[in-house]
Amino acid sequence: MIENKPAKVLFKTIMPVLLLITLVISFDLFFPPIALSDLSYNNVMYKILTDFFDVIILIPFFVFCLSKHLFRFTTHRRCLVFLLLFLSLVFLLLILYNFSLVNVYAAFYYLIVIAFFEEITFRGYMFTVLNQHFSFNKSVVISGIVFGFSHGLYSFLLFGTSIFSVLNFIGGGIIGSYIFSFIYVKTKSLVFPIYFHALLDFCGFVLF
């Protein structure tokens, strides 16, 4: 069913996400995050605390989404359970491939701080709500634009990247949105896009 007032739907759906992103960026501007490549035993507690508060910011949003029954974490099919176990094994092997404090923390970071946060926000909430009013493709593109824009804005404000790089992030955000939304729709669970998202980021960090 197509919504008669798409602009109103977009506004009501996008604004909570922009508010959430604004809170995260504001916190990280006051307490600059430590890059994983700079992590050491001397600063690991600071890294844990700042990442912890980034996750805390998500909790009210997460509870709201659960109260509306917007998404599920279940894995009913046996083959999906085996896939989940396989992805967990890949995570473990990547950590053991080059065992270090940085890689162990990176596995946690990409799974909980990055993938869990982003998939709940952009797939569990934003894509799900949009897809109740718009087609799959429109929902993917809209959520992907916001997904990429938030990454580009974060990178620009905290790491000083070019403002034009935001366009690259938006393009990548749309591609990522297609991949993760497709997995979400096919599995009917956020578990798999979260795991796959984290695995892609973690592989990129460990191998490249």
Listing of model-derived features with the role each one plays in the protein:
Residues L89-L92, L111:
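Transmembrane beta-strand segments that form the barrel wall of outer-membrane beta-barrel proteins
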